[in-house]
Swiss-Prot record:
Organism: Mus musculus (Mouse)
Subcellular location per the Swiss-Prot or TrEMBL entry: Cell membrane
Protein name: Histocompatibility antigen 60c
Lipidation (GPI-anchor amidated serine): 177
One Gene Ontology MF term: natural killer cell lectin-like receptor binding
Glycosylated residues in this chain: 51, 81, 114
Record gene name: H60c
Entry's Gene Ontology cellular component terms: plasma membrane; side of membrane
Length: 197
């Protein structure tokens, strides 16, 4: 009965809010990601329980690559502060955005689902044109839609809805449905739940 309650609790959770606060410096990525307010991944502290390099190596590599691209696009040597906010339902990306703080007063918002860019101040359009980059947009989209989703599905039971098989890093051009495979037992569990209830 306890197992059934655990499965029911996991299934009803369904929607997850994943937020990250990252700091990008020259060849350095630091910060934390949380799911529904609980710390999930730690970028930079190798001894932390949520070490991103160990929990989600493909995600960590993707974010490291993106941070290097962002660093090359900025003018100056100030650290970039990046905030990501995204929502997932049963492991699938619903919506989200990246807020790239280019200096103390200006931010650029990237909405990868509808491929739009927006700036916090309209007087800073030259900065946005400098940042608007199709490869960066594609990489951000891939991280939100594939890498974060895979990491949520294969990580701690506190955050996933259903058991999943181990996943491999998804190729950028690979369809989302192929990126993370569900366990063949997912359907059986749902049938069992319906039968019991």
């Amino acid at each position: 009965m306890a197992l059934l309650l655990l499965i029911l609790e996991s299934c009803s959770a369904g929607t997850y809010a994943l937020n990250c606060k990252l700091t990008v410096k020259y060849r350095t990525l630091q910060g934390l990601c949380s799911v529904n307010g609980k710390t999930f991944l730690d970028f930079g502290d190798e001894n932390h329980e949520g070490n991103a390099t160990m929990l989600c190596p493909a995600l960590y590599q993707s974010l490291t690559d993106i941070s290097e691209v962002m660093w090359s696009l900025q003018s100056g040597n100030d650290a970039l502060n990046v905030t990501t906010r995204s929502q997932y339902y049963q492991g699938e990306f619903i919506d989200g955005f990246w807020d790239i703080n280019t200096d103390e007063q200006h931010s650029i918002y990237v909405y990868p689902l509808n491929k739009t860019w927006r700036e916090s101040h309209s007087d800073n359009s030259s900065a946005m044109e400098q940042w608007k980059n199709k490869n960066l947009e594609k990489d951000i989209r891939n991280v939100l839609m594939v890498d974060f989703s895979c990491c949520l599905n294969k990580s701690s039971p506190h955050f996933r809805e259903m058991p999943t098989l181990p996943t491999t890093a998804a190729h950028v051009d690979q369809p989302r449905s192929m990126a993370c495979k569900s366990s063949p037992f997912d359907g059986l569990i749902m049938i069992l739940l319906i039968y019991i209830l």
